[in-house]
Amino acid sequence: MNAPTIDRATFDALKDTTGAEFALELVDTFLEEAPSMLADLRDALAAQDADKFRRAAHSLKSNCNTFGALTLGAMARELELTHVSKVPGSGGQPLAPLADEYSRVAAALTALRHE
């Protein structure tokens, strides 16, 4: 069985802790900034810049876990712990699975935002 794209308990806890309105502002900010985080990962991978790669993966991981995007967070954590020179390829696009999962997360967060 696949894990849900967004862990609803984590997302609801965020809303309870911060208030629904602020949680939705955080969602909007994440949806605006996450593509830059993914671009930073791609750029760092292309440049073999280990420090930038680790920082970008860490930022993505932390943000994902805040919203309950646990699968994407785990993928980012795996990248954070993997040296940039050891990132496995995937048909020449090693970050494609991460980008695909982000697309699912963005769609799920957008749907939750409009509930």
Where are these regions (language model features)?
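Two-component system phosphorelay core
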Residues: 1-115
